[in-house]
């Protein structure tokens, strides 16, 4: 079952009631999203072998929070949603949606915010990006969206993605439509933008016990039932792995049918878990899954594959 975005004026009353039962989509809640992520990254950096990199990621997340409010986006997506709905495509499809110059404006603002905090190689990277031409930046963005990671160095990718993510999250936050669940394929990709998840989370509160995948680009979350592979939708050969015990707040769900895994975070075990931060801070679990022969079915926005990986 995939999820398609339906314009508000095309939803019947029965569909509106159905959408209220189990929300198929949770559009990004941008207020304090990046500050919460930055705080969680700093907290997880304590006594973590990746402490320096987690603090580095926290700096980027904090800069995203500042730039988000300094550079708001105004855009009417009504026509785009109608067109995408008619085509059965995500409304903000990364493979077809033309990129506005706004995302490069966000990138330059991020660089300006981060410069005073950076030194050494990291400072050299953002200064290099600052000097890049408009076309060079567009080429890097296109390569990342095409998963051509060998064309973008892994030290530049997090900065490019941080700006693209801000842009797409701002657009997703403006979608004036509703969502309904309908049968289809490719539920492993975000129904709003078509990007990959970073991790999944079993939530508390109004969505208690429901699992949502978190988009690594537009920050949307979409519902996928538990005990089913989020990559191939099979359920017969799933295994759950953790570094601590059965009550761990972070587990990896592996599937022997497709040979992949995705992390699951449990808010009931640790209410402060955050989709990006906790995924990044648990790379030891990724190493274990690689040893077991499984491939990761997601990408963390702060950790892109390098050339040859």
From Swiss-Prot:
GO terms for cellular component: cytosol. InterPro entries: FdhE-like_sf, FdhE_C, FdhE_central, FdhE_N, Formate_DH_accessory. The keyword Isomerase does not apply. Its main location: cytoplasm. Pfam families: FdhE_C, FdhE_central, FdhE_N. Keywords: Cytoplasm. Signal peptide: none annotated. The keyword Cell inner membrane does not apply. It is found in: Cytoplasm. Necessary for formate dehydrogenase activity. HAMAP family: FdeH (MF_00611). This is Protein FdhE. The lineage of its organism: Bacteria, Pseudomonadati, Pseudomonadota, Gammaproteobacteria, Enterobacterales.
């Amino acid at each position: 079952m995939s999820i398609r975005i339906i314009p508000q004026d095309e939803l019947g009353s029965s569909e509106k009631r159905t959408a209220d039962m189990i929300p198929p989509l949770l559009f990004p809640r941008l207020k304090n999203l990046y500050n919460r992520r930055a705080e969680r990254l700093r907290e997880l950096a304590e006594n973590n072998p990746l402490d320096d990199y987690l603090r580095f990621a926290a700096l980027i997340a904090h800069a995203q929070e500042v730039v988000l409010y300094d550079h708001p986006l105004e855009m009417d997506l009504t026509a785009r949603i109608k067109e995408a709905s008619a085509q059965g495509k995500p409304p903000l499809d990364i493979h077809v949606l033309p990129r506005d110059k706004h995302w490069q404006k966000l990138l330059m603002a991020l660089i300006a915010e981060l410069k005073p905090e950076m030194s050494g190689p990291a400072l050299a990277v953002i200064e290099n990006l600052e000097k890049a031409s408009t076309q060079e930046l567009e080429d890097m963005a296109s390569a990342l969206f095409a998963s051509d990671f060998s064309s973008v160095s892994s030290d530049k990718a997090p900065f490019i993605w941080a700006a693209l993510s801000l842009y797409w999250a701002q657009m997703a936050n403006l979608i004036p439509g509703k969502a309904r669940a309908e049968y289809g394929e490719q539920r492993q990709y975000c129904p709003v933008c078509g990007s990959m998840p970073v991790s999944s989370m079993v939530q508390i509160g109004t969505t208690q016990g429901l699992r949502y995948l978190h988009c690594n680009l537009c920050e949307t979350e979409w519902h996928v039932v538990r005990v089913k592979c989020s990559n191939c939708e099979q359920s017969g050969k799933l295994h759950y792995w953790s570094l601590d015990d059965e009550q761990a707040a972070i587990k990896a769900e592996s599937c022997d049918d497709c040979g992949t895994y995705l992390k699951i975070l449990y808010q009931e075990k640790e209410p402060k878990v955050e989709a990006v931060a906790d995924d990044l801070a648990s790379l030891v679990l990724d190493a274990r899954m690689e040893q077991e022969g499984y491939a990761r079915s997601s990408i963390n926005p702060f950790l892109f594959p390098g050339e040859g990986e």
